[in-house]
Amino acid sequence: MLYGKQLSACASFAGFLAVAVCGILPVLAQNSSEDVHIQPRVQAAAPKEPDIDPAFKTHTKPLKVDVNMVLVPVTITDPLNRLVTGLDRENFNLFEGKDQQEIKTFSSEDAPVSIGVIFDMSGSMGGKIERAREAVIQFFKTANPQDEFFMITFSDKPEEIADFTSSVDDIQGRLIYTVPKGRTALLDAIYLGVTKMRQAKYPKKALLIISDGGDNHSRYTEGEIKSMVKEADILIYAIGLYDHYFPTEEERLGPALLSDVTELTGGRAFTIDNPNDLADVSTKIGIELRNQYVIGYRPKNPVRDGKWRKIKVKLSPPKGLPPLRVYAKTGYYAPTE
């Protein structure tokens, strides 16, 4: 996890801190718009009206990946939790089950992303809402002009307040008029976010969850949501803002819930206790999405049996580097057709 002191230290740098081996660069999150390498977007047309039923009464057909090519986004960090760039194809080894796979494609380019923001508007967010809104704004500043976004807010139930759009201003404008109230239907909001992402136009997809607690008002269970995100080819990131001194029961369970859900997808969960750190963490997540490796392989097992197949990415880093950590999705469901 990235704690407040580390974030402050990272944010004070003006650029990148070079690792003196083989040109490997740990990428640090920045605060100001001048520090972001992507230029601001041009205003786009207003989004269309949402067409997903907010009641989402029934499960939809599980997502399946094309068994002929599996794409695995990978994030690498150093012991100080900084992003590590500059690695090559030969530094990665990928396994499906016990069988090593041949890497067919390898990229570290900044590709457009379809992004959904899941924003907690429950009553307990009342004193933190302005910082949380600022965090969303900072996250958007790391986007590139081709990205598309949608936003879901949730309290007693989730609500899609902005359909897919490239207009950051439109989403920010809608967020201003939301009022914190009610309980926390986090799991239902994740369900709606994953369902909505089926309309995404880009192969790379990500959800960002901003919440101050666990769940206390959802119809879907934790097990159902974990099964769903395993079926979806979506990176999930989360920022959990918790009171470590007087936590509620939901807050005590919240960090583990977010960590478990994000880990399945190759994303990460960040836990903080100071609302002032929200903007720094959201910027870090945005930059991380721009500095990932994407590995593609064709499974040696061609059987279309619909079964869960475990994935493991291992590193063979250049000599002299400290221990590095790998974040990647844990597997995928093979198709049946």
Language model segments and positions:
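Generic low-polarity alpha-helical segments
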Residues: 1, 28-29
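N-terminal secretory signal peptides that target proteins for export/translocation
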Residues: 1-10
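Compact, basic/aliphatic-enriched, mixed alpha/beta core segments that act as assembly/interaction modules
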Residues: 2, 15-18, 297-300
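Bacterial N-terminal signal peptides
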Residues: 12-26
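Scaffold/interface architecture of coatomer-like assemblies
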Residues: 29-337
